[in-house]
């Protein structure tokens, strides 16, 4: 419930394959029946007037892979992470690839990821998500040259095979980035269009070509082809073209079939037509049904989450609400809960538990910088992330306090050191708290404390065995909390005698159900 809406939800197990239903509204003084097109005070006999669910097709059921809701993701920007064990060179590099130059900026490699799997797993991650790793021109690897090989600045195909195998041996999953909305300037098909103009057999692979197609050196010159945003070096692909669809669907199959990856994160997914995504889903799921598909969608994403396109999306709304409440402290607990409730109620339950909940990524400012380097605010946000419904995603280095408001800063090289900083120890405790308590992954969510003009927020996560209660005191004043019949799992600033929380304190309780 919030200022504007009451929210209701029911899980119905029906023995009937056809269901007709209506809503009964009762405020204690008046009862109305709602049939969609009209209200009435009496029951309607004509079932054609009812809401109807004529048949539940398996293909229409949103069913993300079962492993997803238990996952804790560690998101790695490969160029920035590691060259070796607890080390990154910070040095730029250039490599030749089929006559083209690929570039690295900070020296990160796949070998560096392999040699730091102990660190990632000990932190509490059960899955790694790698930003683009295929051969591409620039350090970020979003300007693709070759979709079938690892960028030489990052290593070899065999390095990647070893990474996947090593992760699987540890019980960890691997998700990679799929960039199909656009390619690089020197991608073979676009290069053919530039060289052969209207005679190119790939001219229909791209949008809005004006011949002759040229690569403008001046960044202020608008190109004679459609591109990603205003990035002239990233021509936009025509994913409505069956040839383009089949090419990229085979890419999707290839990395699952040959390297056994566990998922695709799909770049700028909302800019690509649904027909392509449905074909891509079918291609990938035929190879490995448990391969997760996560779309990059910045807005509300119900459209893509009905079981026929994606299993999950990057939940930037989660970040936005956490920013307002924890980092900026610009909204109170009641408003935060209203926004979180609205976000939760948009999605079907299986999808809600598979949403990728991030505080930051390679595209946005570091959350620690939004907290103005205040570890207390950061810690409360992280604890909420690890105890909320959905898959928590940690961007590399967040646990080490990497700071950055601009792109050059928030893709900063990993700050390796021998000792874990205090923030990293907090991350480790919070991530392990989640993985050790199934109620935090699969349990129901219920708000128990969220008042106006107050920063105290409380909620419960409950499964068939355990109830976990969390209180976050996101304010500069101490706060009393309701008595809880349970034992403390973790606390900071909790005074049991007075049942109160210190400013910016928290308490996590557990009790058997």
Mark where each language-model region is.
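Carbohydrate-interacting/catalytic domains
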Residues: 1-72, 77, 83, 89-91, ...
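Short, flexible loop/turn elements at secondary-structure junctions
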Residues: 12-16, 77-80, 134, 151, ...
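Substrate-binding/active-site clefts of carbohydrate-active enzymes
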Residues: 71, 77-126, 133-258, 280-286, ...
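Hydrophobic faces of well-ordered beta-strands that scaffold small-molecule active sites
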Residues: 72-74, 128-130, 174-176, 264, ...
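Conserved, mostly hydrophobic/aromatic
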Residues: 76, 120, 130, 147, ...
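Aromatic/acidic polysaccharide-binding cleft in carbohydrate-active enzymes
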Residues: 79, 306-308, 312, 353-360, ...
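Short glycine/proline- and charge-enriched loop/turn segments
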Residues: 141-150, 230-232, 316-321, 407-415, ...
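Active-site-proximal helices and loops of the catalytic beta/alpha 8
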Residues: 164-172, 182, 187, 191-198, ...
């Amino acid at each position: 419930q919030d200022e504007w809406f009451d929210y209701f939800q029911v899980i119905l197990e029906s023995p009937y394959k056809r269901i007709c239903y209506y809503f009964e509204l009762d405020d204690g003084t008046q009862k109305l029946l709602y049939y969609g097109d009209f209200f009435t005070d009496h029951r309607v006999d004509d079932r054609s007037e009812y809401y109807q669910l004529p048949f539940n097709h398996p293909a229409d059921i949103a069913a993300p892979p079962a492993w997803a809701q238990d996952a804790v993701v560690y998101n790695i920007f490969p160029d920035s992470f590691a060259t070796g064990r607890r080390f990154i060179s910070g040095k730029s590099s250039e490599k030749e690839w089929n006559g083209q130059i690929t570039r690295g900026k900070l020296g990160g490699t796949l070998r560096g990821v392999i040699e730091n799997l102990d660190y990632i797993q000990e932190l509490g991650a059960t899955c790694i998500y790698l930003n683009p790793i295929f051969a591409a021109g620039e350090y970020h690897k979003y300007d693709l040259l070759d979709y079938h090989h690892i960028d030489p600045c990052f290593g070899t195909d065999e390095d990647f095979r070893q990474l996947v195998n090593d992760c699987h041996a540890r019980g960890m999953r691997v998700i990679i980035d799929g960039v199909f909305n656009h390619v690089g300037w020197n991608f073979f098909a676009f290069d053919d269009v530039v060289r052969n103009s209207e005679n190119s057999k790939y001219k229909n692979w791209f949008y809005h070509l004006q011949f002759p197609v040229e690569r403008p050196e001046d960044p202020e010159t608008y190109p004679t082809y459609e591109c990603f945003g205003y990035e002239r070096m990233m021509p936009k692909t025509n994913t409505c073209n069956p040839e383009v669809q089949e090419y990229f669907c085979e890419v999707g199959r290839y990395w699952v079939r040959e390297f056994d990856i566990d998922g695709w994160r799909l770049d700028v997914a909302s800019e690509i037509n649904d027909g392509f995504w449905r074909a891509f889903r079918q291609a990938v799921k035929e190879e490995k049904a448990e391969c997760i598909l996560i779309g990059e969608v910045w807005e509300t994403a119900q459209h893509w989450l009905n079981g026929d396109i994606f299993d999950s999306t990057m939940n930037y709304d989660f970040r936005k609400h956490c920013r307002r409440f924890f980092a900026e402290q610009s909204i109170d607990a009641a408003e935060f809960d209203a926004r979180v409730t609205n976000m939760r109620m948009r999605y079907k339950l299986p999808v809600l538990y598979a949403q990728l909940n991030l505080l930051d990524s390679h595209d946005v400012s570091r959350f620690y910088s939004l907290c103005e380097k205040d570890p207390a605010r950061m810690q409360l946000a992280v604890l909420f992330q690890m105890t909320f419904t959905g898959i928590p995603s940690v961007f590399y280095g967040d646990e080490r306090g990497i700071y950055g408001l601009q792109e050059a800063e928030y893709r900063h090289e990993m700050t390796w050191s021998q000792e874990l900083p205090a923030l990293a120890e907090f991350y480790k405790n919070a991530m392990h708290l989640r993985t050790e308590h199934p109620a935090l992954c699969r349990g129901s969510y219920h708000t128990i404390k969220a008042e106006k003009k107050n920063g105290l927020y409380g909620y419960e996560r409950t499964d068939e065995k355990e109830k976990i209660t969390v209180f976050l005191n996101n304010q500069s004043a101490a706060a009393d909390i309701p008595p809880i019949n349970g034992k403390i799992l973790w606390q900071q600033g909790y005074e049991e005698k007075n049942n109160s929380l210190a400013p910016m304190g928290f308490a996590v309780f557990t009790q058997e159900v």
